[in-house]
């Protein structure tokens, strides 16, 4: 199996930054909900490149996205 991104909703909603959505190379994969104030992943489209994890963890120091095995994913991509 492969890895896909998963947003940690409670952590992500603290920042309301939307930066990760700007860097995902796959269209309509990493999106943002204004209602919940957090990003979410369409795990069926996620290619597992982990660029969003790099942006969130390394550049922004927020640790709101993690990579999980595709077999353990949920459709919404939010934990």
Curated annotation (Swiss-Prot):
UniProt name for this protein: Ferredoxin oxidoreductase 1 subunit ForD
InterPro entries: 4Fe4S_Fe-S-bd (IPR017896)
Binding site for [4Fe-4S] cluster 1: 12, 17, 20, 56
All residue ranges annotated as the 4Fe-4S ferredoxin-type domain in the record: 3-35, 37-65
Cofactor note: Binds 2 [4Fe-4S] clusters.
UniProt feature coiled coil, ranges: none
Cofactors required: [4Fe-4S] cluster
GO molecular function, one term: 4 iron, 4 sulfur cluster binding
Superkingdom of this protein's organism: Bacteria
Keyword Aminoacyl-tRNA synthetase part of the UniProt annotation: no
EC top class named in words: oxidoreductase
Species per Swiss-Prot/TrEMBL record: Aquifex aeolicus (strain VF5)
Record bears the keyword Repressor: no
Matching SUPFAM superfamilies: 4Fe-4S ferredoxins (SSF54862)
Keywords: 4Fe-4S, Electron transport, Iron, Iron-sulfur, Metal-binding, Oxidoreductase, Repeat, Transport
Residues the entry annotates as binding [4Fe-4S] cluster 2: 24, 46, 49, 52
Binding partners and assembly: Heterotetramer of one alpha, one beta, one delta and one gamma chain.
EC number: 1.-.-.-
């Amino acid at each position: 199996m492969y890895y896909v991104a998963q947003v940690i909703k409670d952590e992500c909603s603290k920042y309301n930054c939307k930066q990760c959505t700007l860097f995902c190379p796959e269209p309509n994969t990493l999106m943002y909900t204004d209602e919940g104030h957090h990003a979410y992943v369409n795990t069926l489209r996620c290619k597992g490149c982990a660029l969003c994890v790099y942006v969130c963890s390394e550049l922004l120091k927020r640790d709101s996205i993690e990579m999980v095995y595709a077999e353990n994913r949920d459709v919404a991509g939010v934990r």
